[in-house]
């Protein structure tokens, strides 16, 4: 979702909404400012929640789902800037917290490799898919892409993929959140 917005928001605003290039380019600034504040805020919130980083991430993903609906519906420049600021705030929190959560699940001597693997897979699948395939699907001059017998074409299909990615991400975070909760409760019992 991050790369889908980061790379394609200006193009979406120009193609689908008929914006000027100047207004469309500014979308990234608002997204990135939200990202900076979101990374700091979600990290701080997860500390307040006593290390429940995946729970924070799940909360962010649920809110992000509804903000993505807004993103697909708003047409005015300042409404879009606001939505993209909020999306940046929401998207980058889980991205940061996933990397931090990894630390709690592996031995110290495997931290760098584990963090590297999560980053590698995020970029191999998320970044590559969003850059290549979302662009191909959204491109009005192309025929779209066949996936599981469905022809995905246009911005509506692009949003469908982003919604699907959020659902999958949220579902994948649930077992990690449950394991994290178990670790937190065990540590609490040991300290009593």
Where are these regions (language model features)?
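Helix-to-loop junctions at the C-terminal end of transmembrane segments
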Residues: 39-51, 138-139
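C-terminal transmembrane helical hairpin of 12-TM major facilitator-type secondary transporters
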Residues: 52-101
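Paired intracellular helix-loop junctions of major facilitator superfamily
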Residues: 50, 102-112
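Multi-pass alpha-helical transporter architecture, strongest
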Residues: 71-72, 155, 159-192
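A membrane-interface helix-boundary motif in multi-pass transporters
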Residues: 53, 136-166
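A late C-terminal transmembrane helix in Major Facilitator Superfamily
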Residues: 108-142
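Hydrophobic positions within alpha-helical transmembrane segments
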Residues: 27-31, 114-118, 158-161
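Extracytoplasmic gate region of multi-pass secondary transporters
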Residues: 1-42, 95, 99, 126-134
């Amino acid at each position: 979702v991050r790369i889908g917005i980061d790379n394609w928001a200006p193009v979406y605003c120009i193609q689908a909404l008929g914006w000027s290039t100047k207004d469309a380019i500014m979308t990234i600034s608002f997204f990135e400012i939200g990202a900076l504040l979101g990374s700091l805020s979600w990290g701080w919130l997860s500390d307040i929640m006593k290390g429940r980083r995946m729970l924070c991430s799940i909360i962010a993903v649920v809110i992000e789902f509804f903000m993505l609906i807004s993103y697909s519906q708003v047409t005015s420049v300042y409404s879009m800037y606001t939505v993209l600021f909020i999306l940046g705030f929401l998207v980058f929190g889980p991205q940061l917290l996933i990397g931090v959560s990894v630390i709690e699940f592996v031995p110290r001597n495997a931290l760098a490799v584990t963090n590297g693997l999560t980053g590698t897979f995020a970029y191999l699948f998320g970044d590559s898919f969003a850059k290549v395939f979302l662009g191909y699907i959204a491109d009005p001059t192309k025929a779209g892409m066949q996936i599981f017998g469905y022809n995905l074409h246009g911005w509506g299909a692009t949003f469908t993929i982003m919604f699907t990615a959020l659902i999958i991400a949220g579902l994948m975070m649930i077992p990690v959140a449950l394991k994290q909760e178990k670790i937190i409760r065990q540590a609490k019992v040991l300290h009593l």
